[in-house]
Amino acid sequence: MLIVLGGPSDIAYENGERDYTNIAALGIPILLFSRDIGHGGDLFSSRGGDFAKIDLAWLNWHLKGDTTATGKGLLVGSGCTYCTNSAWEVKSMSIQ
């Protein structure tokens, strides 16, 4: 499961954080990406911005089995640039 949020200024932030905690407690694989840019994130940026890249990487990974930088590799491990970027909050549980 994937949750992408627009940070504390996002109206959905508290619910998304709570959903992450509850789903993770069930042992269901889950990722959360959040950047403080508000509800809707940067989806209206050229080509959908980072939010669209994250969404597409998740779909590529789970629907196409893509483990490269256009799939799982963008979201976890050494290829995850969001994971080391201080502008992003990234959490994961039970991801393999």
Stretches found by the model and what they are:
Residues G48-Q96:
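Catalytic active-site module of serine/aspartate enzymes centered on a nucleophile-bearing elbow/loop
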Residues M1-D66:
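Active-site-adjacent alpha-helix of alpha/beta-hydrolase-fold enzymes
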